[in-house]
Amino acid sequence: AKSPLSLLAMLLDNRNDEISPSLQAKLDYVRSQLQEDVTQMLYYARLKSSTKDYQFKDINLNDCLGEVLEDYAPLLEEKQFVIINKLQSETVYTDRRGLQFMLGQIVSNAIKYSSDSPMLTISMIHSETADILSVEDNGIGVKKYDLPYIFQKGFTGDSTDSRKKATGMGLYLVKKMADDLNLHLEATSQWGKGFKIVIFFPKLRSNGGK
């Protein structure tokens, strides 16, 4: 059986020529918002489950990111985001669905707290012990005294209009998923200038082991 969201998607796609471009854009935007809410609920349940179905394998990071950006395209286009993707052909060893969920929540966070000329920069550096993925935006950022609490459940920080509407679940779920996948997270921010989140993928197999 098809879910209501997939039926909505099919209806929008099939009736594309009957809907004005502006209405189509608005409906795509609403669909993306609904999809994100459903995704959060599903992963919240998954993270609390005693049986996990993670599949660890080498993942092409660019492919993974591309799918996430495609999912969020209506929201990114609505805000007129500029995406700067500096990734090459890197692979990381992790669970694909889990990583895509993390990246999706990080992108969603950047959209919610974006500036007037929003930009998202994705890059990677390599150290001896880890591959380090950085996702940086130029949005409103987080105040210094709030930064230690951003991964706490329900945290929304300063009471700006956009934060008043937030649930405070996105980055909490990112941290929970990172813990499950044995990934380390770090976040830095300058209030009014942007927010950066860094994911460390440990080089676990450098000596032939996993």
Task: Tell me the role of every PLM-derived stretch.
Residues 137:
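Acidic ATP/Mg2+-coordinating residue in the GHKL
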Residues 110-111:
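Short helix-loop "hinge" at the ATP-lid/N-box region of the Bergerat-fold HATPase_c
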Residues 49-54, 87, 91-97:
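Conserved micro-motifs of the catalytic ATP-binding
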Residues 75-84:
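Short conserved segments within the C-terminal catalytic ATPase subdomain
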Residues 117-129:
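Short beta-strand/loop element within the Bergerat-fold HATPase_c
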Residues 142-155:
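Short conserved segment of the HATPase_c
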